[in-house]
Amino acid sequence: MRLLALAVTTALALPALAAAQTLPTMPTLDETQAQRTVRRAAMTPPVLQEDAALQAAIGSAARPAADVARDVYRHPFETLTFWGLTPGSTVVEIQPGRAGWWTAILQPYAEATQGRYVAVNAPLDGMGVEDGSADMVLVARSFHNWHRAGRTDAFLAAFFKALKPGGVLAVEQHRSVDGLNPDVTAPTGYMPESYVIRAAQAAGFVLEARSELNANPRDDRDHPFGVWTLPPVRTSAPRANNATDRPTPLTAAERAEYDAIGESDRMTLRFRKPG
């Protein structure tokens, strides 16, 4: 049995929608460090249950070694438990990318639990499931791209339509200092948490819980090549036609400093479709 390292402080049964309205207030630009500490302490922690199939998928020798090495930053068991993944779920992952980090866990998990995993790269062309049938739509590190392309609202509407009533929109996203203009932060890969929350709420979702599972206080978001300066991408020199990049490459010492930060500071959010 897996030893559960995080204390259980809430029941796994998801709170009623009315309770979701008592979430802590959003941060402001003049928020002090003490206020930030209090606000984050009030966020809902994950509740861990023994899920043998999920543990087996995460611990599988079939997962690439490079993926496993990132578990220390991405906390797959805790994060998926926080989002409410259960055996037999129909999970739609949006734009999993070539590496498919979550895919390597979710696909075998679905197969082992008689669930369904669907990868969707172009949500506006189809969500790969019947309307109102998905238990979870998972979005990892994509809101900055959608904002730049002006597709956030249309994508969220597609997710809402695909989810069954009570279904979950699961979000992991590089997090900027809150209150900043997303037009400015998006090219760096980071997005304000309040922007993501308000966009999802405008699409009809209810914010049910936030977690600091994937927070990284070492990440000050001030990097010469955006979030891609950090692992796992580790961009170390200016990219062609990228106006936000520093014009000079990293020195060896700088490269080591950014590697020591680890992966980005990220918001981890759970939204629910009412019903």
Language-model regions: role of each:
Residues 86-98:
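Conserved class I S-adenosyl-L-methionine
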Residues 251-275:
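C-terminal lobe and adjacent flexible extensions of AdoMet/dcAdoMet transferase-like proteins
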Residues 166-174:
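Conserved beta-strand signature within the Rossmann-like core of class I S-adenosyl-L-methionine
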Residues 182-210:
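Conserved Class I S-adenosyl-L-methionine
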Residues 54-82, 86-87:
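Class I SAM-dependent methyltransferase Rossmann-like catalytic core
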